[in-house]
Amino acid sequence: MPELYIITGSNGAGKSSLGGYFLPINIREKCVVFDGDKLFIDKQREIWKSGITAIKEAKKIAIAFVNDTFNSLIEEAISKKNDFAYEGHFTNDATWDIPKKFKSNDYNIHLIFLGLTNPKISQTRVGERVKVGGHYVDPKTVKANFYGNLEKLDKYFSIFDTLKIMDTSVSEFLEVCNLENGEVVSSVENYLLPKWFVENLPYISQIISAKSNLKT
């Protein structure tokens, strides 16, 4: 079966810089991970250079271009049964239509989630990224993405064939858990679960706790 890999998580958690390392080698070799944020920035700069300097107009054109490109790539991948990989945020129910679409077309779907301790760290990481030429995200959006991604993950996690959740708050990343079809395959001990994980992923935490209790 063809494979879909999705990389998501908090702003500044390393989706673009680190996410690819968590992909299987065969996917890294075959797929270019679609990065809508990067494509948007590149397109917006291209639009400005073309002479359109109105910020709202340039943004509107760039967003439309990204959406059209993404949708075209999705349709092409599904029609050819090609593997596909992309990164993004999943803060509302509509954003989950894409994984469901691949699932309904007989894809194995996989999610890699990169989490951080809190929105403050997320915003700090974004600030550091901007200093070296990366894209800016305003604090309101950072906070909405931080909590929105977690809320929807706890709701929809069972649709994935595999789910890997990492804590990338510090340089030594913590592989928090791995799930297959909604069931825990591996996880850290309960006392090692990060606070952000327990507080914002209550259902997944409950499943991990239940499995841990069965071992004792």
Where are these regions (language model features)?
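Short hydrophobic/aromatic beta-strand immediately N-terminal to the Walker A/P-loop
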Residues: 4-6
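The Walker A (P-loop) glycine that initiates the GxxxxGKT/S ATP-binding motif of P-loop NTPases
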Residues: 9
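Walker A (P-loop) phosphate-binding loop of P-loop NTPases
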Residues: 12
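Conserved lysine of the Walker
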Residues: 15
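Conserved substrate/cofactor phosphate-moiety recognition/catalytic segment
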Residues: 20-80
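Glycine-rich phosphate-binding loop used to anchor ATP phosphates in small-molecule kinases
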Residues: 61-113, 149
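A glycine- and Lys/Arg-enriched "phosphate-lid" helix/loop adjacent to the NTP-binding pocket
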Residues: 107-153
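NTP-dependent small-molecule kinase module
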Residues: 156-216
